């Protein structure tokens, strides 16, 4: 990159000499290519942004965003990776952006942050998001049941789509009825659908 800097300076100092300004842009482009080869994507992005109209700079810029996003994804920076993929609009960027969201959801699930996992799994077109979301609802349902929040438990179980949880719903309703048998019968019966 240093040799390109020297060439750029030399052409800049050439003033209006024949093709000097074109050579500055060409050297700048070559410097960006060298930075990409060295995987210095931030520097390459910065340079390519100044010469977007030259040759295939826009395509190269998109590749830089994409490659930078891949690095961010690999390092677990899912939000930043998602943004960078979307900025790239390159190759399979939408699928890769969905992967970022999915991996973030997996992380939430692993940390038992089921509510945020559900929000992240909301992309129904990627992998097995619906099934993963179901696991979150089941975990929340079990948690609520354990805490004797039976109505809440049933509400979570009723959101499960792909798995038969009818027994868990019935158990939750029964537990709710037993817990509220001394409460106003009308409220309990209305909830139970009777």
What role is predicted for each listed range?
Residues 7, 14-15, 50-52, 87-89, ...:
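Alpha-helical solenoid scaffolds that mediate protein-protein interactions
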Residues 24, 61, 97, 133, ...:
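Residues that mark the junctions of alpha-helical repeat units in TPR/alpha-solenoid scaffolds
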């Amino acid at each position: 990159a240093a040799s390109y800097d020297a060439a750029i300076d030399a052409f800049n100092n050439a003033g209006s000499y024949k093709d000097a300004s074109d050579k500055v842009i060409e050297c700048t482009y070559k410097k960006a290519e060298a930075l990409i080869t060295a995987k210095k994507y931030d520097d390459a992005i910065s340079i390519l942004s100044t010469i977007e109209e030259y040759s295939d700079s826009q395509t190269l810029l998109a590749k830089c965003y994409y490659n930078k996003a891949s690095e961010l994804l690999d390092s677990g920076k899912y939000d930043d990776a998602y943004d960078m993929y979307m900025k790239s609009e390159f190759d399979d960027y939408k699928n890769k952006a969905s992967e970022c969201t999915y991996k973030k959801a997996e992380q939430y699930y692993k940390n038992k942050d089921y509510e945020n996992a559900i929000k992240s799994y909301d992309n129904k077109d990627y992998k097995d998001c619906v099934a993963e979301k179901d696991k979150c609802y089941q975990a929340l349902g079990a948690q609520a049941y354990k805490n004797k929040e039976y109505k809440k438990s049933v509400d979570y179980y009723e959101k499960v789509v792909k798995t038969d949880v009818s027994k868990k719903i019935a158990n939750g309703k029964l537990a709710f009825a037993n817990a509220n048998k001394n409460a106003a019968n009308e409220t309990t019966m209305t909830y139970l659908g009777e």
